Amino acid sequence: MKRTILSIALALCVGCAFAQSNAFAKLADIKGVEHVVINKTMLNLAAKSGGDFDFGDDLALEGMSGDMLKKLENISIYNCEEEDGVETMSKQVASILNGRGWEPLVVGTDEDGEKIKISQFKKGKKSTIAIFHEEEGESALIVLEGKMDFKKMIEKQVEISVND
């Protein structure tokens, strides 16, 4: 099983806008896309346990305190390793993140062609943060929703890892 690690240096305060999650729901219908949702109840249980958090084979959060997890409403993870699905997913994610209200925070490509795009959508105190990673033959999207403080995440050097 290949492990894709998305290390995030976070520079802004973020919470999440529930309405935006509906825009991503269609990604789960793409052939080859695996979709996992970690809801508020599970996040609260993880927050009570303390330390780093590993949600099975799907997601690991390192450096995130229980107080930070309590501010999350849910985490959605979309993974795809099928070539046609990766292309379709990439186009749909680009369409969403280039849409009205989304602010790009980080956009980058490395020498191997791996791409990362981190964007946020704010609505009042809540916002949605989308972390999209793409490389040859696979893509992963993490959508965080809640009232998180990105500044604190930077200070704690939070690392988000997606296992696929």
Language-model features, listed with the residues they occupy:
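Localized chelating/binding microdomains
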Residues: 14, 22, 57, 73, ...
